[in-house]
Amino acid sequence: MQTPKRRRGAQGCPRSSPSPPLLLLVGAVWFCAALSVAAGSFELTILHTNDVHARVEQTSRDSGKCTGQDCYGGVARRATKIRELRANHSHVLLLDAGDQYQGTIWFSFFKGREVVKFMNSLGYDAMALGNHEFDNGLAGLLDPLLKHANFPILSANIRPKGSIASNISGYILPYKIINVGSEKVGIIGYTTKETPVLSNPGPYLEFRDEVEELQKHANKLTTLGVNKIIALGHSGFFEDQRIARKVKGVDVVVGGHTNTFLYTGSPPSTEVAAGNYPFMVKSDDGRQVPVVQAYAFGKYLGYLNVIFDDKGNVIKSSGNPILLNKNISEDQDVKAEVNKMKIQLHNYSSQEIGKTIVYLNGTTQACRFHECNLGNLICDAVIYNNVRHPDYNEWNHVSMCIVNGGGIRSPIDERANNGTITLEELTAVLPFGGTFDLLQIKGCALKQAFEHSVHRHGQGMGELLQVSGIKVVYDLSRKPGSRVVSLNVLCTECRVPTYVPLEKEKTYKLLLPSFLAGGGDGYHMLKGDSSNHSSGNLDISIVGDYIKRMGKVFPAVEGRVIFSAGTLFQAQLFLTWGLCISLLYFIL
């Protein structure tokens, strides 16, 4: 545990030392003030996680599969740090702000049993529901999580409708009062109201405005004599701040959904801080409310110390997310349980998903240089996974997908094993354990992304975008940055989907790998505003489910990515050079 550093005085010209009487007076004032604070104060330590996304095992620096020595997170390592902090602090709460579900093969196989097992083992005190907890429908939430959790699961803004209310009565609570030492702490949960678009909660749950519902329950807690209230939820950093400003009575906001990294000082790893930790928000009634998130994927453990006065006002808050790196050992008992469950994954990975009757070309020579049919299959699967809830204005809320060619790591041969596709083969195609996320982006930024896609085309570097719902024409004879000749996108606000020219000032929804959403492969223009970025499902789960549903697949090269005739000769020259580079890549 790091002790927060004291702020030093400003550096400048030497100052004369205060006289002894003045020092005594100042010391007396500070001593009396300290006594008055200590007399009625209560210190609470809040440990928190959010957006863990089924990272049961330790992961790489970028939260993919860990294959080397530089590994992070995992439930066993988190258990060690939690045990240490509980031993060193008197009043500790361990909270989760949602999206434990979805993200690795662990969830694909165990379907949440791994979540409830290890959250129970680590002794969580409360959890707010995230949108991904509904990915397997209400039934997949009810069993295993709701029925087997040893901790309260919260959301104040979810209202059941009709007969479903009796099925979940008592399982999803709006709030919970927890006795911490001699004090009562109220925790109110909330879930993004966009869940019906982002997941599969079904038609019988209503997701209401977070602020309105939180205020109702904060008022109720106040009437019950609770003056220390935490809002714990999953609606994103922007909404977390709105809650801090608007909801009277809420003292601390612990959030999730946008994978926001907050940190005071120099960050310990590759994440760039979106602000200080805690992020202080001035409420409309004049209070300073700390808002926190702890990035995602279990890489960090949020660590917030809050001091309340005897009236429940926050008088001090401090801390930082703790990087769970190799300097923290893994708890051996928890690790043994992880290894025991991991044995069951072996047979799962060899199961048949479906068949292909064509060669699924995921080679470097294909996907990094021109349109490839495996890239088309992947993006078509992602669009299919996100087709839901048409309305009068739109046939779907999103129509476009991109994936970088460098993220496609292997072909699948239709002549091997009679065209059978196994989970192991699909994992070889998409080995990084990433997700396909939803992003809102301006047309001008999307245009920049496609310029970046070919800014050094021919070098086999992996930036070339494979697409669905997009048609792009390039001219490689032009200078980098001006090579996009035309860019058409599939309309959503239409009854018959057709391709229309991209509008630079229009805001679009785009599906893309989490790697690109984080600015990977130089796509900094896609990183954008984290408040408009929603984490999605595991890539192999999306593609695997699509292949299962189709039974047999036969994706084609369809002219989604075209190089104009004037540049074909130039492209061939680049390709020859690129093949040499690719060979070196695989050798090294």
Swiss-Prot record:
Q: Which residues form the propeptide?
A: 565-588
State any GO BP term from the record.
Answer: AMP catabolic process
Q: Post-translation: what modifications?
A: Venom 5'-nucleotidases (or a part thereof) may be released into the venom via exosome-like vesicles. They may be attached via a GPI anchor to the membrane of these vesicles. Soluble forms of 5'-nucleotidase might be released by cleavage of the ectodomain in the exosome-like vesicles or venom gland cells.
Where is the secretion signal located?
1-40
Q: Which amino acid positions bind AMP, per UniProt?
A: R368, N404, R409, F432, F515, D521
Q: What GO annotations for molecular function exist for this entry?
A: 5'-nucleotidase activity; metal ion binding; nucleotide binding
User: S-adenosyl-L-methionine as a keyword?
Assistant: no
**Which cofactor does this sequence's record say it needs?**
Zn(2+)
Q: Which residues bind Zn(2+) 1?
A: D51, H53, D99
Site positions for Transition state stabilizer: H132, D135
Which superkingdom heads the taxonomic lineage of this protein's source?
A: Eukaryota
Catalysed reaction(s) here are:
a ribonucleoside 5'-phosphate + H2O = a ribonucleoside + phosphate
Q: Where is the lipid attached (GPI-anchor amidated serine)?
A: S564
Q: Which PANTHER family match?
A: 5'-NUCLEOTIDASE, 5'-NUCLEOTIDASE-RELATED
**Similarity comment: family membership:** Belongs to the 5'-nucleotidase family.
Q: What does this protein do?
A: Hydrolyzes nucleotides into nucleosides. Snake venom 5'-nucleotidases are widely distributed among venomous snake taxa, but there is a lack of information about their biological activities. They have been shown to inhibit platelet aggregation. This effect may be due to the liberation of inhibitory AMP or adenosine by its action on ADP released upon initiation of aggregation. Venom 5'-nucleotidases are also known to synergistically act in vivo with other toxins like ADPases, phospholipases, and disintegrins to exert a more pronounced anti-coagulant effect.
Write the protein's name. Answer: Snake venom 5'-nucleotidase
